[in-house]
């Protein structure tokens, strides 16, 4: 039977071939806090405490998965997003801080407005829809998804959200076409999406834990048409029931920011479109307003 301190030392040694020492320390700490159900302060004080056989087995299984580049969020089965703790699995993207920035922008701009109707296109884990439903409780939020795995994961997150009547409504369908999913939508005030936007040629620069484990369907745009989903979104805005001067909020590929902006500034039903920076200063988001 090993102590917390001894397995920390051994795990850091094993992980050092793939991760920086700081990354490895963080991963080991998170695993131990989860497995032992203790806080960071308690972990610091538990260096000489022994692990039981089950805890040790669980820990080394997780370390082995880390050595195969598996994201720790998939290993743990959950990920934070704002004040939410979301179930995640390989069928959905792991929620990113940039996406949380986009959600915070929407909340800041629309807080206090009542009767909002919001559509999240390609909801994945449901992170955007749930964040907005939680922070804008007077809004009615709809979430569209086509992937079987993602639908199941989003529904699980919706069911456990505790939001009651504010829980998003999950719609099954494809954002590339207006199907039966659109028939029950009220006039929308906001469309939001974090669609696939990575170009396949960018794969060589991506971290193995993303490239080897997260769903390519949600990551990559078609090589022949990297702005496919953005054109589809502005076309949806022309075909779905929309309020006058409704808003569109999108996460995008900073390498294609100007091209993405051009898609919207050239659309006849778009009154205005603007790029917004993320916290690192990159053009990461687009906001557009429909004609009044």
Which residues does each PLM region occupy?
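Non-catalytic accessory regions of SAM-dependent methyltransferases
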Residues: 1-43, 48
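Conserved Class I SAM-dependent methyltransferase catalytic core
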Residues: 223-289
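Conserved RecA-like P-loop NTPase ATPase core
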Residues: 31, 158, 194, 210, ...
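Conserved SAM/SAH cofactor-binding pocket of Class I
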Residues: 98-205, 232
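C-terminal beta-strand of the catalytic ATP-binding
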Residues: 197, 289-292
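Mobile active-site "lid"/loop adjacent to the S-adenosyl-L-methionine
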Residues: 197-229
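Conserved AdoMet
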Residues: 32-108
